[in-house]
């Protein structure tokens, strides 16, 4: 709590940025996780899954501390509701990442050649959608310096639109993946089918929440 208080003293957005770094750290593990699945390195899968869970727990702790500080009346230049919505949505991204990590440890899952390539495209776009909105969060101090206007605000709007476009691309790739999984010509073990559909759903949750987060950041500009 004392550490967080010092962050609030440095900048009203520093705690939010500290939280987004932990969420980002959990998202960054997804590529190595799925690469380990591809290589059949299940010990590495277990180790990386534990790392994701550790980052998610740390993010939860920061989230709860931020909520406590907001309740105590600390000054912030945006509405408390906006701040709470942003932190909650960020945390939902970390939750999705942890869910994926847990699902990957349920059994020794494998890729099927019919969807491996498109899956990694889907994964790349999903991770990218969060990376873009995380960039907007990291630059909120600069927004404050510009009084939420000018070129800095326009740059943030561009990032918000980029996230929306990426989320749409994720939707299209998700649809293609589901078509493959449900195709009558595609053969897959029942347990694998259940796990892959759940994994795809959780990955979609990351891009959906990234879009929600970007929208909320964009709304802070309109509220000024």
UniProtKB/Swiss-Prot annotation:
Q: What is the name of the protein in this document?
A: UPF0111 protein TC_0063
Show the Gene3D superfamilies listed in the entry: Phosphate transport system protein phou homolog 2, domain 2
Fetch the Pfam families from UniProt: PhoU_div (PF01865)
Matching entries from InterPro entries are given as: DUF47, PhoU-like_sf, Put_Phosphate_transp_reg
Q: Which NCBIfam families match?
A: TIGR00153 family protein
Please report which protein family the annotation says this sequence is part of: Belongs to the UPF0111 family.
Superkingdom per UniProt: Bacteria
